[in-house]
Amino acid sequence: MAEKQAGLAGEPNPDCTVTAKAGPEVSSPGTSESRDYDSNCVFCRVAAGQEPETELLYCENKDLVCFKDIKPAALHHYLVVPKKHIGSCKDLNKDHIEMVESMVTVGKTILERNNFTDFTDVRMGFHVPPFCSVSHLHLHVIAPAKEFGFLSRVVYRRDSYWFITGDYLLEKLRK
């Protein structure tokens, strides 16, 4: 029981509550129902260029932005964020699969642009509510993972109750 709760079995946590929702709750690509911008959201302001102290890194995707994490867990720690406001990975549905795939691609590209190519030593994933520091969907791109201190190994633990990889999220959205 404790092994399952702590996610020590090495398998994705089957109790993770990220599910493929039937319809949009916060934002859905191409709908007028989406709340594209939240002035109270720091990541919305960063994406809109309203936080001049945050340097946006080159990103080839017009719907995403990328910038360095303010509390890096390793030498390379970037955040890939959709420009449209989406609360968290729990707000996603099948319509968001392409966006999540693009976020992962942008993450890999930013690492390559910064001369990091050992993708066996990379941690990419999303925090699951209520463990999100900012309520705006963001992909953590962190390398090298072998540099993690004790706390970072806990905070960014793969497929735990609080942090899931992009691959795990995509698997859940496709079901």
Curated annotation (Swiss-Prot):
Keywords: Acetylation, Cytoplasm, Hydrolase, Nucleotide-binding, Nucleus. One of its GO terms (cellular component) is nucleus. Pfam families: DcpS_C. The active site is at 138 (tele-amp-histidine intermediate). Signal peptide: none annotated. InterPro entries: HIT-like, HIT-like_sf. A motif (Histidine triad motif) lies at residues 136-140. Expressed in retinal ganglion cells. Forms dimers to octamers and even larger oligomer. Interacts with CALM1. This is Adenosine 5'-monophosphoramidase HINT3. It comes from Rattus norvegicus.
